[in-house]
Design a protein with these regions (language model features):
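Short alpha-helical segments that sit at the start of domains
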Residues: 1-38
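Short, conserved alpha-helical segments within structured domains
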Residues: 7, 25-28, 52, 64-68
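DNA-recognition alpha helix
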Residues: 27-58
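Hydrophobic, Leu/Ile/Phe/Ala-enriched alpha-helical segments that form helix-helix packing faces
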Residues: 15, 36, 51, 55, ...
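Short, cationic-aromatic polyanion-contact patches
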Residues: 86-104
Length: 104
């Protein structure tokens, strides 16, 4: 985990705090982005203890759905996360075909 970028650590910590471990507890990148932008105690996660408060705030402010998806794809390639086949999910009244992800 030490080799991960601070941004990847934020995304991993969000998955962990949401309880997205194992295929029965998967979540979408949209839910992760919402969790990151709305959760005040995310910085208290053990993985983020060494990230300075200013760096943490900068990371949170720069996060968007594209960056979250890119970071999740990187975590999947490293074998840390797992993705599902796309499923049809309604988000904000719009039906989308999305993958769900979870920590292995």
């Amino acid at each position: 985990m030490e080799t991960l970028s601070d941004k990847a650590k934020v995304v991993y910590a969000a998955f962990d705090m949401m309880g997205a471990r194992g295929s029965e507890n998967k979540t979408t990148s949209y839910a992760i982005l919402d969790f990151i932008s709305e959760t005040e105690d995310l910085q208290d996660h053990d993985l983020l203890k060494e990230v300075s408060e200013q760096d943490f705030v900068d990371i949170i402010m720069d996060m968007n759905i594209k960056s979250v998806n890119t970071l999740i794809a990187s975590l999947c390639r490293k074998g840390i996360m797992e993705k599902t086949e796309p499923v049809s999910i309604k988000i904000d009244g719009v039906r989308r075909s999305l993958r769900q992800y979870f920590i292995k």
